Amino acid sequence: MSTIMVDTNSELCILTPLDEDDLESPLSGEFLQDIVDIQDITQTIGDDGSTPFGASEHQFFGNSPGSIGSVSTDLTDTLSPASSPASITFPAASGSAEDAACKSLNLECRVCSDKASGFHYGVHACEGCKGFFRRTIRLKLVYDRCERMCKIQKKNRNKCQYCRFEKCLNVGMSHNAIRFGRMPRSEKAKLKAEVLMCDQDVKDSQMADLLSLARLIYDAYLKNFNMNKVKARAILTGKASNPPFVIHDMETLCMAEKTLVAKLVANGIQNKEAEVRIFHCCQCTSVETVTELTEFAKSIPGFTELDLNDQVTLLKYGVYEAMFAMLASVMNKDGMLVAYGNGFITREFLKSLRKPIGDMMEPKFEFAMKFNALELDDSDLSLFVAALICCGDRPGLVNIPSIEKMQESIVHVLKLHLQSNHPDDSFLFPKLLQKMADLRQLVTEHAQLVQTIKKTETDAALHPLLQEIYRDMY
């Protein structure tokens, strides 16, 4: 038996990292590709980087020493001395710089729109589609033809392999397009520009949708309400051709009842006392406004698709808040318009009426003065009223997520609209949110007062529709 002599005193040859010139050589490229192929074996056995084996049960697919999955590190450990201060790192085919670029740019896979992990086979792709394409090419797989032209997305990319491979080819994946090294600055700049342009396109599309929503709501507002702020302000400021008839005492009230609201007081209440007649007229006006608000709500995108019970609930709790918000448009510090703007009843006369009916309108005037100070126009009010109706926190709602989604869209477009329409008042939006809370309190107090009137005023019958709204409200 011959003896092998080993010179233990000779110096070991320390391996050094490869230079750029070495990496650019064809031989190095082939060697590195072989290393990449070994690294990706476990990823390509199962789609999307997963394997049919559990790593804990089959350690040769894990990262244990000597395993295939850790060949990059273990190969280095085998070739270099134990005392070596550093290990060799082989660049992946896509390049760590490109992987970092993909992550920083949030690029999507060109095939399935999942998050791209790098530049694979000529396009930015995710690990799943990279492995799928490599497996198909290497194994020369042929898939059953599909004529449905399936849409390939992250959630369904494994369902139709034929269409997935066709998508890979259509977006430009090619086995000959493997690239080594860093992403050129010019290409990175181009990618950044594309991402920014894509983001801007998305923002522009979202803005267009919001503007469309605002326009639909505003058009519905103008269409469904007999009185709006533009008309009311023209009358209240004396710009209308026919000034309203002023009701300031019992005599002028009787005159108005014979002309302006003759139909309202002709149903057997003309002989009742003034407070009862006024309460009756207020109810008639409220019923008409509830009808207008119902038609307006139906024009809000998505409202009629809601559960019917939810539609009723939203209107039940929202109509009076919306009504009092719009009532402010026909009010000033001295009084309010009535009879479609043909009459004007003074604030002092309303306060002089017998209690509790005499207490009914004063809280609305106090709210209106503060609300009118915000100087909203009809486009602002239309969105505000829509937001009041579509509130997802009303009691008894069934499909809350859908309603909250509607409300979120409306409130968002309201905020953007206020920023555009009132650029000098940055606090207008939070002020309006506070007004929503104020309106809830106002409606609660009004409902309590109506119940008091119902109990104490035997002649003051409540309209059936309003009675249904008030039932179990608060």
Swiss-Prot record:
| Molecular function terms, GO-annotated | DNA-binding transcription repressor activity, RNA polymerase II-specific; lipid binding; nuclear receptor activity; RNA polymerase II cis-regulatory region sequence-specific DNA binding; zinc ion binding
Zinc finger regions typed NR C4-type: which residues? 109-129, 146-168
Report, as the record phrases it, the tissue specificity of this protein.
Ubiquitous.
Q: Name one GO cellular component term.
A: nucleus
Has UniProt tagged this entry with the keyword Transmembrane helix? no
- Localized where? Nucleus
Superkingdom of the source? Eukaryota
CDD domains under this entry?
NR_DBD_Ppar (cd06965), NR_LBD_PPAR (cd06932)
DNA-binding span(s): 106-180
Pfam families, sorted: Hormone_recep, zf-C4
**InterPro entries xrefs:** 1Cnucl_rcpt, NHR-like_dom_sf, Nucl_hrmn_rcpt_lig-bd, Nuclear_hormone_rcpt_NR1, Nuclear_hrmn_rcpt, PPAR-alpha, Znf_hrmn_rcpt, Znf_NHR/GATA
- Which keywords label this protein? Activator, DNA-binding, Lipid-binding, Metal-binding, Nucleus, Receptor, Transcription, Transcription regulation, Zinc, Zinc-finger
GO BP annotations of the record are:
cell differentiation; fatty acid metabolic process; hormone-mediated signaling pathway; intracellular receptor signaling pathway; negative regulation of cholesterol storage; negative regulation of inflammatory response; negative regulation of transcription by RNA polymerase II; positive regulation of fatty acid metabolic process
Start and end residues of each NR LBD domain: 245-472
Q: Which family does it belong to?
A: Belongs to the nuclear hormone receptor family. NR1 subfamily.
Q: Which PANTHER family has this protein been placed in?
A: NUCLEAR HORMONE RECEPTOR, PEROXISOME PROLIFERATOR-ACTIVATED RECEPTOR ALPHA
Summary of the function given for this chain in its UniProt record = Ligand-activated transcription factor. Key regulator of lipid metabolism. Activated by lipids. Receptor for peroxisome proliferators such as hypolipidemic drugs and fatty acids. Once activated by a ligand, the receptor binds to promoter elements of target genes. Regulates the peroxisomal beta-oxidation pathway of fatty acids.
* Subunit structure, interactors included: Heterodimer with the retinoid X receptor.
Protein name as it appears in the record: Peroxisome proliferator-activated receptor alpha
Species of origin: Xenopus laevis (African clawed frog)
